[in-house]
Amino acid sequence: MEMKQINETTLKIMITMEDLEEHGMELKDFLIPQEKTEEFFYTVMDELDLPDNFKNSGMLSFRVTPRKDRVDVFVTKSDLKEALDFNDLSDMEDYSGLSPEEFLKALEDNFMDKGDIEAHHKLEEHDKTLKEVDETMTEPAKEVAEETIREDYTHYVLAFSDFDQVVTFAQGLKNVSVEGSEFYKLGDVYYMTILLYLADEPDYYANNMYARFLEYANVADRTRPYLQEHATILMEEDALPVLQATKWS
């Protein structure tokens, strides 16, 4: 387990799947607060060397977010002098064994308030890089740097008429690996952004992959910036790998 202090009121605890197994925990144990979950959090808090301002700090709330290889627990303290509150496990879903409808409802219910969770999207990193280019480089140098970034990566926005189509998309692309992916809902339509890394691939790779995507998805009528501003984000990162790994009942 690793711990990182985000700010004065929030800690991020990174728990590997091996850590969970050692403590007799499974992902599904976090779906509904229970005594086992409470005992696990007490154990984690005891094992870690908490910052002084988190010791005896009163009420603590927890948000649990699954990743591909670990579970991230965000611990937020309040000034209320109450016992630990284990009822705020709002960001955790049991990704296996749910029907598509149950999975979707869990996402819509639990991914509305992302609070202080750090975003590590590759696309956002590239946006930041381009801004730094604008601030520090001469005009010819900027053109070269921007062109290099664009050549190394490409991204697509795909649309889905319903969640069943999303499931079919993920199942049909079981062996496809992408650099990044996000999952949105706008009205009755679902959207997924896909980031591909092209540097080590042949020239035809991007077109071939896009054609494969469109075997299961539709061409989107919205851009990523538009979705970021107007849509509900259901999964901030690794959307496709999570959906690929999910066993649908």
From Swiss-Prot:
Q: Which GO terms describe its molecular function?
A: protein-macromolecule adaptor activity
Query: What is the name listed in the Swiss-Prot or TrEMBL entry for this protein?
Result: Adapter protein MecA
Record-linked HAMAP family: MecA
As for what it does, the entry says: Enables the recognition and targeting of unfolded and aggregated proteins to the ClpC protease or to other proteins involved in proteolysis.
- Secretion signal, residue range per the UniProt entry: none
Domain of life, per the record? Bacteria
Supply the gene name.
mecA
Question: So what family is this one in?
Answer: Belongs to the MecA family.
Short name of any one Pfam family annotated for the protein: MecA
